[in-house]
Structure formats: structure tokens, C-alpha cells
Amino acid sequence: MKKLNLLVLLGVFCGVSGVGDADVKVSDALLQSILVEPKIRVLLLSESTTALIEAKGAFSVFGDGELLRVSSQGQRCAAHALYGGIRWGENYPNVECLKIEPLDGAASLFVNGIQYRGAIYIHRTDRSCLFIVNELAVEDYLKSTLSVKYLKELDKEALSACVILERTALYERLLAGNSHSFWHVNAQEDRYGGFGVTSQFYGVEEAVDWTSRLVLDNPEGLVFNADYLLRANVDRLAIEGYNARQILEKFYKDADLVVIESWEDDCKGA
């Protein structure tokens, strides 16, 4: 069962109805912290015979949910599916799913030379092939995918409005997806290139941080599309003095600005 918990912003943007001195910008919002950062699982490789996986720094290994190993040093080995388990540096017999997770912020993971935030899952299929999945925070995923989409500099309020819509559309996809799958989205389809593509210097990372976990919610089920804002010359509104919320109100008058408190589904691996 998929569950999305929302917190409607009543006080954070109170009194903002037009352009004026009382405006509160998205970057000034005080958002409530949450205990668990919402995560997304991304399919990196499917039906692969092998994958080169490297852990730089301390990491832990879980097999089907059970802690199997903790290492203070890195490891660089090819992963293979065995008839009775998975091999990555050593054999893990009778394991269907192996999870590799960094132990601290200084550690990092690489798959076939590409760096990824979060954890890496290695799933073994009945045909002795591998599915490689990256689990990371939704906010980090947005930083990566939007960094290769927004390659033109926008005013920070215009970009923040677009990011809120992009995040909204992503959560709508997560809610509508197949909960019986090991992953939520496909890296190739979403042009997800891992951590290395995030530093494009067009303000995307900052806009994601400024609007952290903010989405639009409407019980009538509006279609939220950031591309529509871009075609409508959203940058012009920001230059005229509109903040991100006011920009969104011009296009989605009945939608509420809410904070994602938590995101849960039945997509489970190791």
C-alpha cells in the first residue's frame, strides 16, 4: 500500500495574496523536519550478467534484509549472479537481494564508473541475471535529473516554482506506479546520471534545497506540468516581482502548497 503524508502550509505563507512588501519567498520558508527522508528507487541496469560496483570508504552489506558484513575499507569488484546467490568480492549464498550502503557521508558508491548517492541494490533473477537499483533521497534525485533538464539560467523564484511542479509530478508518478516492482523509475527513461551531473551552476541544487519537500495538492486532480510554465515565460513574472508561490497561484488557483512529511510504499528489497 502506498501512502503519502502531507502537511498543508497555513502559517508559513500567511497573508501573501499579491506582490508587495509582505511577500514571503519560498527560500524564506521554515519547513518542519521529518524523521525519515523520502526515498526513491531507480533502476540502473536490467537483465545484466555483471556490473562493476565500487564502494569508496566504509560500507555495510545486507542480504535479504539481514546485516552480513561491515567494512571500514572500500571495495571494487564485479558483481555476478550465482545459481544459489550473489557474488560481490565474496560469495553470498542463498541471497536474492544484496544491499550495499555507505556508513557515513564521506563514503560513496560507483556502478560501472558512475557515482551515486544512497544505497545500491543487487537483485538476482531466476535466469541468473542482475537488476541493479539505486535508492536515494527524492531531493537528491531531483537535483540530478533537473540539472540536465534546466540548462538555461532562470530567476531563482521562477526556477523554484518549476521545481515545485517537477517534485509534484514525481510524487504523482510514485503514487501511480507498480508497488510490486523493486524500483519506482527507470534511470534511462528519466535521464538520471547519478551524482556527478548535479553541479551545472544554473541554480537547480539551490532551488531544490529552497523548496525542499514542497508540492502542490489539489483534490480535483489537476495536471501539474513545469514545461507549461516555461512555455508561458515564467521568468518574466519573477522579474516583475512575483515570488514562487504567487507564480504558481496564477496558474493553479485552487491548489494548496503542502510539505511532504513522509512517503511509504511496499517496494521492499534488502
UniProtKB/Swiss-Prot annotation:
Cross-referenced InterPro entries: SpoIID/LytB_N
**Name assigned to this protein:** Uncharacterized protein CT_041
The record's Pfam families line, in alphabetical order, gives:
SpoIID (PF08486)
Source organism (scientific name)? Chlamydia trachomatis serovar D (strain ATCC VR-885 / DSM 19411 / UW-3/Cx)
Family from the record? Belongs to the chlamydial CPn_0389/CT_041/TC_0311 family.
